[in-house]
Amino acid sequence: MNHSADQADDVLRISMDAKAIVKVGPFARGGKSRVQVEATDHDFQPEATVTPVGIFLPTLDELFVYGITSKVTSDCLVDRIVQWWETVRERFAHITTLVINRDNGPENHSRRTQFMQRLVEFVRQYHIRVQLAYYPPYHSKYNPIERCWGILENHWNGALLDSIEAVLAFTRTMTWNGVHPVVELVTTTYQTGVKLTKEAMDRVEAQLQRLPHLEKWFVDIPYPPPTSWDT
């Protein structure tokens, strides 16, 4: 799937994931620093938290990172796809299909009602086909963006991430194959627990095409839509 997507001129593959929550404060992070830093002996209540959410383009070595100060919800994740697409859509005007590599996390798995509803809305709004290609349990390490997170972790190990600005600054100065990421701060507050009724999800489900025998792991949201879609 990934290979065929990368070979097609009108298909763009992205790898997306959220990194572990970063606690902001004078906390020890391990590693070594060229300058002397002092960390607390114990991890007390953090001043804030930031969750890096990344979108990586494997064939172009481009990385976009969004520092989320709220909970990372289904709405948050789809909003990041929208935010990213708005910045690149003119450059990728020839793209008709977006393939998204993801792990099967709680906020973005293919049975998560709000996540799937928002993606259907994205397809309709931007007139682009979306295909979700999930990694099965214990295989998320093969998602390409995980390599980027490893580079970032090594980059800021030994540093004090004692402010949100410090987290963003270290993220901006990391490099992937010599290229710095595009980094944005997102302070929107997201509500948790948003979900559709069974009837509403049934309508969404009618707009999805699931691969037989791999229904949870590969989902196609076509455009133009099937004639059964509501107008």
Residue ranges and their predicted role:
Residues 38-101, 106:
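Electropositive, glycine- and tryptophan-enriched low-complexity nucleic-acid-binding patches
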Residues 14-15, 97-104, 132-137, 170-171:
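Extended hydrophobic secondary-structure segments that form protein cores and membrane-embedded regions
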Residues 90, 158-231:
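C-terminal accessory extensions appended to soluble enzyme cores
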Residues 102-115, 136-142:
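Acidic, metal-coordinating catalytic cores used for nucleic-acid/nucleotide bond scission
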Residues 1-38:
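Charge-mixed, compositionally biased segments that are often intrinsically disordered regulatory tracts
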Residues 11, 93-97, 129:
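A general structural motif
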